Amino acid sequence: MNTNLKNLTTMLVALVMLTGAGAAAQDAAEIMEQSHLAYYYAADDGVAEVTMTITDKRGKERTKEFVMLRMDESDGGPQKYYTYFRKPSDISRLTFMVHKIPDGNDMRWIYIPSVDLVKPIAADDKNSSFVGSHFSYEDVSGRHWSEDTHELVGDSTIGESPVWVIKSVPKEKYKGFATKLSYVDKDSYLPLLESYYDKKDKLVRVFRAEQIEVIDDIVTMTVRSMENVKKGGKTTIEFSDISYDTGLDESIFTERYLRNPPRKYIK
């Protein structure tokens, strides 16, 4: 093979390898986008009763009950969440609201009825515990897929479900994790398992989809859990009485309704 032909062959091989790597990265990002939409953007809005069971490292359990309302402006775009706590008595009537802004800092507020106070939650508090659970505030309302780089690292199965295995790394400094492995169902695009690692590559937390049902023709995760491997303990969240496309009024997601919950949905 002459030198010119050899050089051309080398260039073509390199181009194919680069193109393949770019396509794989693009595919991984697309998978994570679809997963985010399937998990956090089902229908245009949603209402559900929620039971949260918090188990500490000694096995002691606490249960909290609340109602969650969600409204989307567009798929992958701004969202609004409203959460009203029923039980236990020490947090009864506490409300929590999020205005998610994909390209900016989310806005979060909490209403504390015991002191009649609406308190903004700082953007850097998004990784703190959501009402004492093993889920963070951001776990509840979602971390946007565009904030991380994604790599398709393989295929596997969870139970009988074939999944993609995606490695995600934050684009900017982030307290939540250094690396995350997501096991995304190839049929529903829901994340069936997520493993969170710190900067020393130590496993810190594990998220699991415990139960999935079809509700109003939408594949829905009705039971999910988060285990803190590093510190111990686990929180399980169960959704019931789920309704989609209810026609929620946008005015619900304002400070007025933090103090005065919408009785149509909070009975």
Spans of model-derived segments:
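Ribonuclease/tRNase effector modules and their secretory precursors
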Residues: Q26-D27, T51-T53, R62-M68, D75-G77, ...
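Sec/Tat signal peptide C-region and signal peptidase I cleavage site
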Residues: A21-A25
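Bacterial N-terminal signal peptides that target proteins for export
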Residues: M1-L12
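Short, low-complexity, Pro/Ser/Thr/Gly-rich segments in the mature regions of secreted, periplasmic
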Residues: T254-K267
